[in-house]
Amino acid sequence: MEWREEGILLSTRRHGESAAIIEVFTPSHGRHAGVVRGGTSRKIAPILQPGAQLDLTWRARLEDHIGSFLVEPVRSRAAAAMGDRLALAGLNAVTALLGFCLPEREAHRPLYVETERLLDLLGEGEIWPLAYLRWEVQLLHDMGYALALEACAVTGQRDDLIYVSPKSGRAVSAKGAGDWADRLLPLPPILRGIGGGPDAEIAQAFITTGYFLTEHLARDLGGKPLPEARARFVETFSRRL
């Protein structure tokens, strides 16, 4: 068995004396693990940084074996992240969430495209939080938790939408909320793709996407806690408000 494709490095861990096991995200093969022989060596270890874009060749005797990777660097994203606390926190959040959420060896091409685009924006501090928010919405969509924000779930109206139902992920208008308003999640305009995305609105939107990541996605994955890297990114972002 063999395939070759570019992918994004999600994580690496030592395996034996000199090898490493890496997890990558690729367009056609999804989240995929494999052994890199010599992965802890001075030559290869610097290549295996989270977020790195790699040219990957995977080989195994049988399809269900872990197999091994040959890796070649395409581009590193470490430099953009290391000089910027927000970028580093964001990179860690993206790779941790993908490792947490993605089923093994299942393609999610639209999410891959959005992930590559997002990581290529690392270091662009003014636009990156909004790009990350849109990526979280895409992540929820691809994992089966799409938000439906075009019309009120109660009245059907398409204006004055200011809440999200924590159960259904559907928008709710001020009129439709009634006495339930204090139990609903915020729906800032930026979450509907309206406006330029001021930081205060993005912070509100993170409350809503974070709820669905924690209370729906993570719970359905056996109740495992969401990776702390996501909370650290939101906290780092909130410091600039």
UniProtKB/Swiss-Prot annotation:
Q: Which GO terms describe its cellular component?
A: bacterial nucleoid
* Keyword DNA repair (UniProt): yes
InterPro entries assigned: ARFGAP/RecO (IPR037278), DNA_rep/recomb_RecO_N (IPR022572), NA-bd_OB-fold (IPR012340), RecO (IPR003717), RecO_C (IPR042242)
Please name the GO terms of the biological process aspect recorded for this protein, alphabetically. DNA recombination; double-strand break repair
Pfam families registered for this protein in UniProt: RecO_C, RecO_N
- Sorted alphabetically, which keywords does the UniProt record give? DNA damage, DNA recombination, DNA repair
The record's listing under HAMAP family reads: RecO
Give the function comment from the record. Involved in DNA repair and RecF pathway recombination.
Instruction: State the similarity comment.
Output: Belongs to the RecO family.
Q: What is this protein called?
A: DNA repair protein RecO
Gene, per the UniProt record: recO
